[in-house]
Each structure stands twice: as structure tokens, then as C-alpha cells.
Amino acid sequence: MPQKTVADGTRAGALAKAPAEAPARRWWILAVIAVAQLMVVLDATIVNIALPSAQADLGFSDGNRQWIVTAYALAFASLLLLGGRIADLFGRKPAFLVGIVGFAAASALGGAANGFTMLVVARALQGAFGALLAPAALSLLNTTFTDARERARAFSVYGAIAGAGGAVGLLLGGVLTDAFDWRWTLYVNVVIAVVAFVGGWVLLGSHRDAADAKLDVPGTILVASGLFAVVYGFSNAETHGWGSPLTWGFLIAGGLLLAAFAWWQTRAAHPLLPVRILLDRDRGASFLAVLLTGAGMFGVFLFLTYYLQLNLGFSPTKTGVAFLPMVGALMVAAQLGTTVLVPRLGPKAVIPLGFAIATAGMAWLTGIGLGSSYTSAVLPQVIVIGVGLGLVMPPAMQLATGGVAAEDAGVASATVNAMQQVGGSIGTALLNTLAASAATDYLAGHTPPSRQVQAQATIESYTTAFWWSAVLFGAGTVIAFLLYRRGVPKQDADAAPVVHM
């Protein structure tokens, strides 16, 4: 009997139902999973606030500081799809618990770091164990909440908590750095992990879908090594320049490895990323939208953090609070975009508009200077950026799994979140490279390098990064307008919603 298909080749089907849990137990399980997921999400931003303090304590260079952020994001992104397969093969509960323990151990290692290398290794290990934990959590939600309405409510709660993780990370990072030490931005994960582990051990049942699940070892090696080579190539350009053979060697090698990965996925019996997930036009447009947004957005957090702390003299806590208006604007726009605008106007009208608004906000932010104030040169600009991103990210992430059968919801969610993390990794490395080059060029043209000249060179590096973020968002405007279909998208009844991991 032929198999039913939806959304350009996506197979229809339902998730294998796990034994039904008691209603009250299900919601306690949701609480445990949400706590664990919050730990993973907030770590993408919590260390940003503490970076200046960590840099001063450990003595690493400006050229190396992006690796504290990139190491986590790259490991998480490159291993996320593999983490989902491991959960299917060995069981969701073991994967979830091992992910929690490993994440906590890596956090403790980072908190005790006595140098740059030890801290980067710890951050990479956090990302690796986070890549095991996040897909397991998603699968546990899908199997625990088998009723469609309950599952929708569960994903709504889970997505809201996960979406707030970035803001929690910024604020919590500031409070911990001010009250204790930058190391507590890592140690705090141990406390959270204990709560999640005990709850998971007591409440979660053991389920596994290993009948036909196998590890795609060649695919894993190709995609992980390809992503590493690309990001390392961008980072190497900052210290050795764009004319360095090493820079282009890594970039070309990374491109070839990723091309080989794409080829292998069309031939592998159990691909890490099934081709059917990529066949829908709106889904492909959403993946690109998330990639470009991640590349530009992570730059905003990193460079604006440095501007607020080093130029405006904000404390880490005050810096975290300074980002809250942007987060608030993003949340309001997200609610408006996903529940009102996209259902009525369609993504072709809404998502390019969001990109255009974010582009305008980033261009406006380039007006910062040595004598600027937060209320005039930062606050209105980040609110505009938040509105724009709110009209792009949540609708794009929702559309990325539109029409996907329930059996493919996990890999689709993993893919869209991998796109965000890959974009963040590449964007952080690329913007650091461009910012450093701008500062060097400014100093070369203004001699002698007085304190005033050096301060202005720093501003030039920030504004250059903001301009290139605007370029990325501008590219998103054009790409989204060209690729998204006209009309209102239709959601398959069996498709599970996407969540931000």
C-alpha cells in the first residue's frame, strides 16, 4: 500500500505512543524537562555578560574571546542531529540523564578553569552534552503528551520557557558576576542540573525506538568536521588575515566536507538529516531565515555587551537589564507575528518585513559614539531590532516544521535549531574578524595612537560589526521575499510544533 505524503515528500505518520502517564505526572515531567532545557538555553548568553571579567582574569586576547561563545555553539550545532539519533538508539531517559550529568560536569570544569584552553574545552563539552540533552527532551515531550491538545499546551509552555532563556541568561549572568564571580555563571548549572536529574530519575519512563535507528557515523564525521573547519577558517582570518593560505585552506576544506555530507545524506540508509525534511520550499526558506538571523543576532549580543560595559561603564547586572527592552519587544512581536499576522497575511508578507525592521534597527545602532547615552543611542534601537527579530524568528521556526509528520518532528526541530547555532558560530567569528580589521585600519590611519584614538578605534570595531549585521538582515529580507510562497500556510494536523532549543 503506498505511503501517504505531505509537504513535498515528508512522510505522514504518528509518533509511537509511549505508555500513558497519569495527568498530574505528565505536567511534572514537563516541569523537569523545562528546567533542563532552560539550563541549555541560558548558557548561550549567560557567559556573554561575564566575558570581560573572564578575559581580565584569565588574560586571553581579544582575538580569542569569540571562542568562548563559538566553542559552545559549534559543538551544540554540529552534534545536535547525532544526539537525536543516540536518544532513539539507546533510550530517551538515559540520553536525558547522561546529558544532564555531562553538562553539569563540563560547567564545573569551566568554573574551575585556570586558563583559556581549559575554559574553551569546557564550553565545547557543554555544547556536546547539550546536543545530547536537547533532542532527548524534545522526544520525551512528544512521547509523554500523546493527546494533540495536551501536546500543544505542553509545547507552548516549553517553548515559552526556552524562549525566555536568553533573557534569563543575560540577567542571571550579570547578577552572578556582580554578586560573586564570573565563574558562578558556570557553577550555577550544577545546581540546576541536580534538580533536573533527580526529577528525571524519579519521573521519566524508559522508552526507546531502536528498531530501525542506526548511527550515521560517516555523516556525523563529515558535518562535524566541516562545520569546525568553516568556523575555524573565519576565526583564523582575524589573526592571520584573509590572505593567509591557512584561512582559505580551512574554508575550502569545510565547504567540501559539507558538500560531501549533503551528498552522503542522499545515499545513507539512515541519514543524520533525511532529505525529505528539506524538500518543502517554505521550510527551506525558514532554515535560511533562522541561519541569517542567528548570524546577525549573536553579533548584537556580543558587541553590544562590550560597548555597554567597557564604554558606557555598565555593571554586568545593569548590562543584563539593558537587554530586557529588546527581549520584551521581541516577545510581543513574536506573539503578534505567530498568532495574528502570519495566519492572516502569510510568511511572504511578515518575515521579510521583520528582516527589514531589524535591518533598520541595526543601521540605526551604528550611530553610537564615545559620548553617547543608553537612552538615546541604544534603547530605541534595540527595541526596533527586537520587534524585527520577533517577526522573523518565531514564525520561521514554526514554519520550519509546518507539514512535517509527527515522526519527523524531532529531526526537523533539531535541524532548525542547528541552523540557528551554526549561524551564530559563523556570525560571531566573521563579525569578530571584520571588527578587528576595522580597529586595526583606524589605528593605522591615526597616529600617534593616543588614548582617545584607541577608544575611537574600539567604537569603529563595534559599528563595523553592527553594519555587517544589518547587511545579513538585509540579505534575509531579499531571500525571504523571493523564497516564501504567497498565501497562508497550512499546518498538518499530525505535525508537532517546533520549539526553540
Stretches found by the model and what they are:
Residues 87, 92-94, 150-152, 209-215, ...:
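Interfacial helix-loop-helix linkers and transmembrane-helix boundary segments
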Residues 138, 190-209, 224-236, 253-268, ...:
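C-terminal membrane-cytosol helix-exit motif in multi-pass small-molecule transporters
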Residues 2-202, 336, 345, 363-366, ...:
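Transmembrane-helix bundle of Major Facilitator Superfamily
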Residues 1-25, 209, 451-455, 483-501:
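Intrinsic disorder in cytosolic terminal tails and internal cytosolic loops
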